[in-house]
Amino acid sequence: MIPVTEFRQFSEQQPAFRVLKPWWDVFTDYLSVAMLMIGVFGCTLQVMQDKIICLPKRVQPSQNQSSVSNVSQAVASTTPLPPPKPSPSNPVTVEMKGLKTDLDLQQYSFINQMCYERALHWYAKYFPYLVLIHTLVFMLCSNFWFKFPGSSSKIEHFISILGKCFDSPWTTRALSEVSGEDSEEKDNRKNNMSRSNTTQSGPEGSLVNSQSLKSIPEKFVVDKSTAGALDKKEGEQAKALFEKVKKFRLHVEEGDILYAMYVRQTVLKVIKFLIIIAYNSALVSKVQFTVDCNVDIQDMTGYKNFSCNHTMAHLFSKLSFCYLCFVSIYGLTCLYTLYWLFYRSLKEYSFEYVRQETGIDDIPDVKNDFAFMLHMIDQYDPLYSKRFAVFLSEVSENKLKQLNLNNEWTPDKLRQKLQTNAHNRLELPLIMLSGLPDTVFEITELQSLKLEIIKNVMIPATIAQLDNLQELSLHQCSVKIHSAALSFLKENLKVLSVKFDDMRELPPWMYGLRNLEELYLVGSLSHDISRNVTLESLRDLKSLKILSIKSNVSKIPQAVVDVSSHLQKMCIHNDGTKLVMLNNLKKMTNLTELELVHCDLERIPHAVFSLLSLQELDLKENNLKSIEEIVSFQHLRKLTVLKLWHNSITYIPEHIKKLTSLERLSFSHNKIEVLPSHLFLCNKIRYLDLSYNDIRFIPPEIGVLQSLQYFSITCNKVESLPDELYFCKKLKTLKIGKNSLSVLSPKIGNLLFLSYLDVKGNHFEILPPELGDCRALKRAGLVVEDALFETLPSDVREQMKTE
């Protein structure tokens, strides 16, 4: 016989699946076991005991004449003979005698089998087997969604993640931290209420006792203690769990196969319950103890009518009623399950209660199969959902990332990355990190902080520890800031650089930095930037002196005009977008430096001539061809630097002689062919760059420039240099490479301060030994072919090689 344990495979599932079995599924499982035992018990009785016992019936002679001759005379009487009555005087000696049928054992077995098959009702015969089959079907229906590949894979994945989330140290840390904060808030509220009842203090006193100020150090202590309990490995495991939960949520929320399958298997169980109740109630009366059997087997047994006893009828009748009770309870439970499935919205799951209890406000609601599984888990233990919700929170994930970040970037490791930037400040560059390490604020000597490609940066109040911080660079970073940190930056920050791809990376809090002196903006703005409200608040930057915008604006923003009264330097790098409507420049009366780079200008803007305080003008990479307007620069008495490089200028007008205050002049990367002698009447020029043009001749008037320190004609077509060039005694840098020069005059020895000389790319055959008189010129400052350098006397070469 098959033992009961062999049927367990029909209802077995992984022990972890129990979290998805609500109380009604557990209850129906126990009912199934009870019904299974009924079926197995009935089948065992069917196999091990006699199913039916039959005896032949005696009939009247008129009805049995054909068979009288085949039986003995003792049984031929028309009425059964009564058994002899024992004598009361001698009861022990009287022998009991019954009716003889003259049938052997084989005939009785044959009669029993024939009557069992022909006369016994099928329900009485197959009742235990029906119970067994129905129970197995119930078990299969209850556990089918645990076995079906389309659903079991999701369930296994979910339970695997759920168990890891439940046991993760990060879950305990996050919930205990929130619990600690909640208790602090309650204590603070009680203290505040008691104090307000006992004393009538002013607003200043109540502010000191407020939670926002008092609880900060307490929370800091909680963070420190809990942070030590989570090592680096556990932090990485928790980080991986967050990623798994995200991917699993996206995958499971797409469909509702689990919900649909559970509903269908429940509906199937209800239908089966109704069928079982219907036919069992109708047929249970067919289980009878006495059965009349009429079979035509006279030729083999001599009898046709038999009276049979169904030996297990009494027990089967009781078992059937018991089975009906179990099935009824099972069915009512399934009906309640259907009510629960259709009455409640199981395709949506709200974490509102968890959000209120834990204080983690950003836990999202879920839907479809994800929601259904969470509803099922709540029937098992709501604590699972509460702990699992921690891994759905971005706030919790950010805290974990912050903790891992702090463990990875220690103060010593950060100090190794310190460097000096272009502003001669001690700078810490952080590129492509998951966040801003809290350990940064332990480097108190930091003067400049540079963040690149870091999303969701939160600048905490601890930035106030950086007493020397003056410069902040944000390149493609979305930044939020604590109110205390903003107050600190308002007072201390001098330089802010922001590089953004969209307006969301342009921090809205930067417009309140009242002590900011330099602002650099790099990113794509709308062409109609004057209507961009995010720039209108620049007027609050009362201390702003330098403003640089590298974008694609079509006109100067009105926000820039709002700070024109104190703006001293403005740079617009326009990436080739034509800049029009420059009349707003006239309002910048205090402007000393102006850069209009790559703005597609064809003429020098007339508005520039109104900037009487202008000292430097840079019109790089425009489309200037004619600069006749240069005569108007004579009104700009303070103009000392003029850069007209990287344009298409073909000639220099003679009016340039009127710019007597010029000290730095750059015409490099143009198409100039002739240098006017009037150029050298600007005798204050110290820096003159004429490289990358088509110049063939240098006028001898260049000797007038006695203040000249830098002169470059690199990449021109000059064939000879005038001797007057060597009258410029203060010349330190001379670049004459990539020309057509064949001889270098020995008078170059007159340039005693010369420290950099580029002669490479000419037709020189020998270098004059007078180069040795240039005591400041060393080998590193002499750009020349190695073979040509060897033409110098050995003592000159040795002199240049010595430092």
Swiss-Prot record:
Record's compositionally biased regions (Polar residues): 191-209
UniProt KW keywords: Cell membrane, Disulfide bond, Endoplasmic reticulum, Glycoprotein, Ion channel, Ion transport, Leucine-rich repeat, Membrane, Phosphoprotein, Repeat, Transmembrane, Transmembrane helix, Transport
Pfam families xref list: LRR_8, Pannexin_like
Chain's role: Non-essential component of the volume-regulated anion channel (VRAC, also named VSOAC channel), an anion channel required to maintain a constant cell volume in response to extracellular or intracellular osmotic changes. The VRAC channel conducts iodide better than chloride and can also conduct organic osmolytes like taurine. Plays a redundant role in the efflux of amino acids, such as aspartate and glutamate, in response to osmotic stress.
The record's note on its domains: The volume-regulated anion channel (VRAC) channel forms a trimer of dimers, with symmetry mismatch between the pore-forming domain and the cytosolic LRR repeats, a topology similar to gap junction proteins.
The protein's assembly and partners: Heterohexamer; oligomerizes with other LRRC8 proteins (LRRC8A, LRRC8B, LRRC8D and/or LRRC8E) to form a heterohexamer. Homoheptamer; inactive, likely because it is not targeted to the plasma membrane in the absence of LRRC8A. In vivo, the subunit composition may depend primarily on expression levels, and heterooligomeric channels containing various proportions of the different LRRC8 proteins may coexist.
Modified residues (Phosphoserine): S212, S215
LRR repeats: 397-419, 420-443, 446-465, 468-490, 492-513, 515-536, 543-563, 566-586, 590-611, 613-634, 638-659, 661-682, 684-705, 707-728, 730-751, 753-774, 776-799
Similarity section: Belongs to the LRRC8 family.
Any Gene Ontology biological process: intracellular signal transduction
Disulfide bond annotation, renumbered to this chain: C54-C308, C115-C293
Cellular component per GO, a single term: endoplasmic reticulum membrane
Species annotation: Bos taurus
TM helices/strands, residue ranges: 23-43, 126-146, 267-287, 321-341
Catalysed reactions, as listed in the record: chloride(in) = chloride(out); iodide(out) = iodide(in); taurine(out) = taurine(in); 2',3'-cGAMP(out) = 2',3'-cGAMP(in)
Predominant location category: membrane
Cytoplasmic face residues: 1-22, 147-266, 342-803
Bilayer topology: Multi-pass membrane protein
Protein name: Volume-regulated anion channel subunit LRRC8C
Region (Disordered): 177-209
Alphabetized PROSITE patterns for the sequence: LRR
Extracellular side: 44-125, 288-320
Compartments, as annotated in UniProt: Cell membrane; Endoplasmic reticulum membrane
Sugar attachment sites: N64, N70
UniProt KW Nucleotide-binding keyword: no
